[in-house]
C-alpha cells in the first residue's frame, strides 16, 4: 500500500495493481472496494465531498462517499495528490504539477 486518507468517517488506502481498500471502524478492519482499476495507485485524498486517487497513468474519482470510483486514464503519472483551498493539486514524474477543482479535469501549472 502506498497512500491513505480519511474522509466522511472512513479511511481509504491505495496500492499496486489497483488495490483499493477501506475501513469504516477507525482502521480496526479493512475491506476491498470493488473496482475495475488495474494500474498502481500511489495516493488518495478527500476534498469537496470527493475522493480522488492518483497513480500510474490514471486518476480515480468518487463523488458518492466512496461507494463507486470512476477511472480517468491519463497520459501522465501522478505520484501524490493533496487538497486545499478548494483545489486538488497533483505532482508527478518529470516534475509536473497539475490542479483540479473536481478531480476530473486537470490543468498543468506553468511555470513552476
For every predicted segment, state its role.
Residues 1-112:
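Residue-level hotspots at or immediately adjacent to binding/recognition sites across diverse folds
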Amino acid at each position: 500500500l502506498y497512500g491513505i486518507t480519511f474522509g466522511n468517517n472512513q479511511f481509504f488506502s491505495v496500492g499496486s495493481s489497483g488495490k483499493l481498500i477501506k475501513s469504516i471502524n477507525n482502521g480496526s478492519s479493512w475491506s476491498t472496494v470493488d473496482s475495475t482499476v488495474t494500474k498502481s495507485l500511489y495516493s488518495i485524498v478527500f476534498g469537496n465531498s470527493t475522493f480522488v486517487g492518483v497513480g500510474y497513468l490514471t486518476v480515480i474519482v468518487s463523488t458518492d462517499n466512496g461507494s463507486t470510483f470512476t477511472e480517468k486514464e491519463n497520459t501522465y503519472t501522478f505520484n501524490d495528490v493533496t487538497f486545499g483551498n478548494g483545489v486538488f493539486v497533483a505532482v508527478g514524474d518529470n516534475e509536473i504539477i497539475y490542479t483540479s477543482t473536481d478531480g476530473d479535469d486537470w490543468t498543468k501549472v506553468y511555470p513552476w
